[in-house]
Amino acid sequence: MTINLIKYGLTTAVQADLTKENGQILGRIIGQHRDWYQVITTAGERSAQVTGKLAYEAASPAAFPAVGDWVCLSSSADNQAQIEAIAPRQSVLARGAVNRQDGQIIATNINTIFICMSLNADFNVRRLERYLTIAWDSGALPVIVLTKADLCTDLATKLRAVADVSVGVPTITCSVETGQGLDELQPYLTTGQTVAFVGSSGVGKSTLINRLLGQDILATKSIRTDDNKGRHTTTSRQLIPLPTGACVIDTPGMRELQIFMGDLNQTFAEIAALATQCKFNDCTHTSEPGCAVRAAVEVGTVTSERLQSYQKLQREMSYQGLNSRQLEQAKIQRMFGGKQAMKRVKQRYHRD
């Protein structure tokens, strides 16, 4: 049976980005396990490893394949599939990794990011701000999915708290138990779309995906009765096709979400707007005279908790110590794998 890769998100742009040599085939990475990968092709799934050449030329871990990447495969003499090339990425969801400047790629080539947060004991708007920061920087559309609505007794209060930190971001309230809100997810799950599910451990990502699949493919565990939290189940990233023709990427719960690069101006739009009114262009909003942001805090327009969260994320973002040239190089490496790959894409674009 021939697999239709359009249902896995294949586009004409992807096909143009990858030049296949004789005998090579196109595929998309649907699973990653240490140094080998699961790849879906028109002929079905293959297990593959990167070639020595690709590994040697990789300038950083970001240049290695990740779940969601489109790749070219070849077969060696022993019929072992090898990854020869990676297509330029249309979007990259990444987070900072402890003691590493290059960050960790979570998923690539995604259209939408479902930021899942449960409405029970897991509810935390400061954590939501972190997820929004990496989501805005990814190039994909963030959507907030509030799960376990059936367990919530103060929904209106929580919705106001979410709205205060997520202006312009769609928010969906749902419950797998009652079916509430599940229809609102469908517009993002049409043929060719790829949606990544992110969120802390136990918020119900796998349970929600199983409901969308119509069968229990992903392992789940019940809620703990002592603290009303779900148990962490997913241990690796995987891309799964839905009956609707879309693909979803389930990701392990992230206990610590370090910020590598992120668009704080999107997540904290009101603070970014106020900052333009500060007396000094390099105002840190701590003790400088003429600070419009601190003035807003004093009158209650911006909460002190919101400002503290903004400042904390600023401090920990790894690009704080980088100059503009280094930041540009880091983003090129993450999206294209290097300047040479970016040049090839630009040359093809101008020819077209």
Swiss-Prot record:
Q: Which GO terms describe its biological process?
A: ribosomal small subunit biogenesis
Residues annotated to bind GTP: 147-150, 199-207
Quote a single Gene Ontology cellular component term: cytoplasm
Sequence positions that bind Zn(2+): 278, 283, 285, 291
Q: Which cofactor does it need?
A: Zn(2+)
> What keywords appear on the UniProt entry?
Cytoplasm, GTP-binding, Hydrolase, Metal-binding, Nucleotide-binding, Ribosome biogenesis, RNA-binding, rRNA-binding, Zinc
Which InterPro entries would you find in this protein's record? G_CP_dom, P-loop_NTPase, Ribosome_biogen_GTPase_RsgA, RsgA_GTPase_dom
Q: Which GO terms describe its molecular function?
A: GTP binding; GTPase activity; metal ion binding; rRNA binding
Q: PROSITE patterns per the record? A: ENGC_GTPASE, G_CP
Pfam families for this protein: RsgA_GTPase
State the oligomer form and interacting partners: Monomer. Associates with 30S ribosomal subunit, binds 16S rRNA.
What is stated as this protein's family in its record?
A: Belongs to the TRAFAC class YlqF/YawG GTPase family. RsgA subfamily.
Q: Which NCBIfam families does this one have?
A: ribosome small subunit-dependent GTPase A (TIGR00157)
Q: What does this protein do?
A: One of several proteins that assist in the late maturation steps of the functional core of the 30S ribosomal subunit. Helps release RbfA from mature subunits. May play a role in the assembly of ribosomal proteins into the subunit. Circularly permuted GTPase that catalyzes slow GTP hydrolysis, GTPase activity is stimulated by the 30S ribosomal subunit.
Name of the protein in its database record? Small ribosomal subunit biogenesis GTPase RsgA 2
UniProt source species: Lactiplantibacillus plantarum (strain ATCC BAA-793 / NCIMB 8826 / WCFS1)
